[in-house]
């Protein structure tokens, strides 16, 4: 299974390279690249629809044992802590959300070349993508939500390499990527459609690279609203950090009942990526269409 996953990453990378090689820009040696990614974009849902998962839903994420253990101890009450209330979404996740996207470009006043793109979403932070070949910071440099991103052209596609990220979720139910994670991103534009492909590598929490994509459509009347935020006290006991001990998260039983997952089958990890995993699931009231089913109680 591991070799299969690596093969998928290799084939995807190779396919993107072939696509780039066949473009007019690549045939001209990379000169005269004209693809412009700037503009206002609206999300056309993602391959997993809106990222608003049930607690315990780690299906399709190649978490290793440590990553799954970390996810299973997560308590949603953690988001009530003042330190978390105004926390922005990080680079490895934010493109998955349902908000509008604005990509601005910075143009050198002398050469007229694009030296950086500035993508921004609702509840995002500064996330510049540099095209001027600047040196990547040393490993001990400070990490941020946006990380450090440098980009190169592959034909008419833009390949972005991102490092120096803070620990952040890859799904908003406790599945995390550590500050050792790096992300390879491709921007691909076909007319008014922008395809955003991310491959997340994390040696600590992921057994294999996580490959996901989202689609955006160009629009002329979208708005990325401001996000003023002030943290407040929400009644949690001072000094308390909400979490569950391993094996004590009650919601893990609910997700098994909801989707008919047997006790000896994982709810996350490499095995859950592949179609064969679906064949191991049992019928449940939820999967039969009863959305009012009292699951797991």
Feature-to-residue mapping (PLM):
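Bacterial N-terminal signal peptides that target proteins for export
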Residues: 1-11
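PEST-like low-complexity, intrinsically disordered acidic/proline/serine-rich tracts
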Residues: 24-297
């Amino acid at each position: 299974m591991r070799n299969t996953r690596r093969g998928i990453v290799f084939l995807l990378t190779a396919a993107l390279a072939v696509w780039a090689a066949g473009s007019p820009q690549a045939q001209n040696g990379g000169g005269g690249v004209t693809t412009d990614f700037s503009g206002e974009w609206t999300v056309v849902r993602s391959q997993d629809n809106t990222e608003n998962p049930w607690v315990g839903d780690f299906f399709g994420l190649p978490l290793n044992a440590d990553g799954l253990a970390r996810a299973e101890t997560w308590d949603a009450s953690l988001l009530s802590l003042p330190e978390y209330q105004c926390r922005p979404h990080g680079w490895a996740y934010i493109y998955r959300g349902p908000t509008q996207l604005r990509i601005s470009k910075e143009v050198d006043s002398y050469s007229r070349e694009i030296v950086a793109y500035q993508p921004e979403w609702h509840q995002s932070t500064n996330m510049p993508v540099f095209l001027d070949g600047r040196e990547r910071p040393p490993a001990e440099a400070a990490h941020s939500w946006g990380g450090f991103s440098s980009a190169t052209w592959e034909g008419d596609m833009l390949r972005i390499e991102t490092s120096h990220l803070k620990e952040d979720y890859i799904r908003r139910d406790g599945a995390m990527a550590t500050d050792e994670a790096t992300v390879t991103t491709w921007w691909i534009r076909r007319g008014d459609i922008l395809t955003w492909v991310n491959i997340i590598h994390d040696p600590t929490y992921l057994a294999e690279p996580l490959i996901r994509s989202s689609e955006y459509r160009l629009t002329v009347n979208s708005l990325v609203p401001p996000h003023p935020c002030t943290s407040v006290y929400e009644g949690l006991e001072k000094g308390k950090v909400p979490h569950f001990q391993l094996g004590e998260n009650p919601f893990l039983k609910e997700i098994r009942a909801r989707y008919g997952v047997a006790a000896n089958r994982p709810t996350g990890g490499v095995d859950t990526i592949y179609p064969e995993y679906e064949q191991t699931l049992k019928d449940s009231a939820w999967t039969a269409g009863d959305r009012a089913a009292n699951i797991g109680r």
